């Protein structure tokens, strides 16, 4: 017997929908030919990695330094964390100490780690609709509850709708930009309006919900 919550996930209609579509697409391509099947499931890149990346991988795969392929810090290599902190400062003007940067293997891993760190049982995470369906599982994996809110007609964030959905159990608001599946990119003004709503709520209640931003 497996854990009930895992059994519930496996039986859920939304479980792995995108992966199921991908597998179905692969089968149909074999049956009818790749040129006759349009796959809108996984967000596989259309372009190959830059040559510089491939060169670096080849270089480090031949690295002879003792221990270079051993275990690393749980948060990732310092050089990678420093590079990400510098990138954030350059692109967003935010001075993030590299010690505050944690590397993860993909967004799914990063979001699960984040939910584990933030959620107590029964805490709520507000998610604007439509959204990436795996968010349901990322939140439920850590005993949280997803609270769905509508966006505006153009799929922009509706700060008032999010404000109306806030409760004493709200731990975070999870946004995704560019949004999957709409492609909407949230503007600075939208995100600032959301931040203002959450700060106002925190000033009032003493609990400041986090903004979790899943970005590409």
How would you name each of these model-derived features?
Residues 1-6:
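Basic/polar N-terminal segments that are highly enriched at the extreme N-terminus
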Residues 66-206, 212:
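Conserved core of the PLP fold type I
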Residues 7-106, 113:
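N-terminal small-domain helix-loop-helix segment of the aminotransferase-like
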């Amino acid at each position: 017997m497996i854990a009930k919550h895992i059994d519930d996930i496996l039986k859920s209609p939304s479980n792995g929908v995108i992966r199921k579509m991908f597998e179905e697409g692969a089968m149909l391509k074999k049956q009818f030919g790749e040129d006759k099947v349009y796959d809108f499931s996984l967000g596989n890149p259309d372009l190959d990695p830059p040559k510089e990346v491939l060169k670096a991988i080849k270089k480090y795969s031949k690295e002879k330094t003792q221990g270079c392929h051993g275990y690393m810090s749980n948060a990732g290599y310092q050089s990678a964390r420093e590079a990400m902190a510098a990138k954030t400062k350059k692109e967003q003007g935010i001075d993030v100490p590299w010690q505050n940067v944690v590397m993860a293997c993909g967004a799914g891993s990063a979001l699960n780690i984040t939910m584990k760190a933030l959620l107590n049982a029964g805490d709520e995470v507000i998610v604007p609709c439509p959204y990436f369906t795996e968010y349901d599982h990322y939140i439920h994996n850590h005993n949280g509850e997803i609270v769905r809110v509508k966006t505006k007609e153009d799929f922009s964030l509706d700060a008032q709708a999010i404000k109306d959905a806030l409760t004493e159990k709200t731990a975070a608001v999870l946004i995704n930009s560019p949004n999957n599946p709409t492609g909407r990119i949230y503007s600075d003004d939208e995100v600032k309006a959301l931040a203002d709503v959450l700060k106002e709520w925190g000033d009032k209640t003493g609990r400041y919900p986090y903004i979790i931003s899943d970005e590409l």
